Amino acid sequence: DPEGDRVTGSADAIVVLNAGSSSIKFSTFRRAGRGLERELRGQVSGLGTVPRLTAKRGGAPIVDRTLSAEGLGHAEALDILLEFVRAELHGEVLAGVGHRVVHGGLEFMEPTRVDAAILERLARYVPLAPLHQPHNLAAIRLMLERLPGVPEIACFDTAFHRTVPEVAQLFALPPRFAAAGVRRYGFHGLSYEYVASVLPSLDVRAAAGRTVVFHLGNGASMAALQGGRSIGTTMGFTAIEGLPMGTRTGSLDPGVLLFMFDELGMSVREVERLLYHESGLLGLSGLSSDMRDLLASDAAPARLAVDVFCYRARRELGSLAAALGGLDAIVFTAGIGENQPEIRARICRDAEWLGV
């Protein structure tokens, strides 16, 4: 193709990007019959510090190298990543690029092809997802410039929760606030959608029944699935609500914010930094936002942070089980959920009354 990557009838490669604040994760897929087969997965990590490119093909490492001793910005990292992917495609034509976008509000309920006008609309949600949305959109913007003939498709974390009943979406505020978009949206929807898609192959009864999914990573949330559809989740208007996270508070009495403003004299920006970057496991422990560090530590504040995390997860489990009217299955996913059996055990141990 004269424009390099324009879609044609023979286009058979897809790239998927998840651009975050300190890393850009990617996968490539090849068309295989009526489905897709993943070929590569990897990431550029350490943005802002020591960037590193790692990638695997079918589970076997094919690259692991430091990119720069002086740091890279997102644009430079994406250019390096794009060059690497093109080389690994060995001449295959790129059919499209998929992007994780955290917030789509009420107007984006399904995967959407992005152009400049759509980007402008998505930018309205940056204040509601300041840790993620700017980086998601920056990656799309760059790909539109680098690959002008290739569709850029945004897939939204909020979209999966469109099935949540209105009573679970609304805050107890006058209707004008809901009309302005102040409601509970929920996040991590792409993760929950994947769980819902594979659960039938693991347990048909659970997939058709009542499941609580724990997405426990640096960002943490839970969702109640009824027959694979979301009916409730712990995150809300923003990705702060719900469980304590690596550096985020989780749910907080709004009166605490009033106290910070009125009595402590904190500014909006100071409170924002506290809520998003200085709280959660890091704030409680004074040590680390990484659950692995806390579990390895004998320090009392580290143990307390783990205790609070597990307690809040158990409490939310009870709440979501009540919304479901019972419980048939529990699923754990994401970094902590998949790799920390001690956390899984501590959450489940005190949930025996639910049949766990």
Which residues does each PLM region occupy?
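Oxyanion-binding "anion nests"
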Residues: 253-256, 260-287
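Glycine-rich phosphate-binding loops at beta-strand->alpha-helix junctions
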Residues: 328-346, 350
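Glycine-rich phosphate-binding loop of actin/hexokinase-like ATP-binding domains
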Residues: 160-261
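Phosphate/pyrophosphate-binding loops at sites that engage ATP/ADP/AMP, CoA/4′-phosphopantetheine
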Residues: 83-95, 199-205, 317-328
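Adenine-nucleotide phosphate-binding core of ATP-dependent small-molecule kinases
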Residues: 273, 280-284, 291-323
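Short beta-strand-loop/turn "lid" adjacent to the catalytic site in phosphate-handling enzymes
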Residues: 85-132, 151-153, 159-170
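Short glycine-rich, Thr/Ser-proximal phosphate-binding strand/loop in the N-terminal lobe
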Residues: 14-16, 23-71
